[in-house]
Amino acid sequence: MGNRINWQITIGTMLLWFIHLGMAAQGMPLTNEAAKLCQQKSYAAALKKADEAIHSDAESRDAYTWYVHGFVHKEIFKEEELGNRQSTHRRQAEESLLRAMKCENATRHEDMIKLALKYLASTYYNDALQSSQVIAGEDESVPRKLFADFRRLMNIAVPETNFLDYEKELEKSLGQHYFTLWQRDTEVGKWRDLATKRYASIVALDSTDSDAYYNLAVIDYNRAVFMYRKLGPDTDMFDAITLQEEASGLIRSKALVNMEKAYALAPEKGEIVRGIMMMHRALDHEKDVAYFKTEIERLINEGKIKADQPK
């Protein structure tokens, strides 16, 4: 689901730096002991020493002391509470790291403080994506609050961050959630409309996103298919003609239009080429169907799409 962030390599580098500075820190025995215990994964003992350090007049003015305190909480969160959106250790880690940024000597430790904040930001982002798949009804407040926390910390850790791709991933994840709910009960048009709204919001953010156009096309195409499925032997002839006209009109005026936009942006993407061919087939556009079948064969021969997928 979505595009999860994984910064384990970066965090590993930060840990080495953390240990080195802990050994080098002068006049801060409590902080150094906390760092050493954290390195040994003795987190309860490390936290006790770190708590003593931030309440020590001699050590609490130093950014490194607050960094170590935040780092210990971060490690406990990572090892014991990862995925817990209400984690007090994550919140405490954040508060201590932000406190470290306000100390007079924060500049000396700024890089490693920001790396720790960047890691915490990534967990908020991943939680936002996960929560978007299990929201109750149409209440998006939880994933959007988590995303806001991600943005807030990233603006501190990496001020030049471009959030466009992250915003699109959240909208996509919400769209997938609503689409899945609609597929479970196609009579509930609310889910279809919400899915459409989310993918349309991606287009508003980035008019070059081929996946968003593709998903909008799929929604309307499936809607037309579900309309066709209502036809049966007992359907009145006039009603059948009306329903067929509405379904084909939906494919022609909405689904195909968005699929053509997707194709213009990504003409060699397998699902898009196959999707546009299927829509032309539904509309009895024989020449277009023949053209796209040839395109699919070319893309298969060039190794750009898999041959085991249906043409």
Feature-to-residue mapping (PLM):
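Terminal, low-structured helical/coil segments at or just beyond the last alpha-helical repeat
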Residues: 233-253, 257, 261-311
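Flexible helix-coil transition and linker loops at the boundaries of alpha-helical arrays
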Residues: 53-64, 99-117, 151-169, 184-185, ...
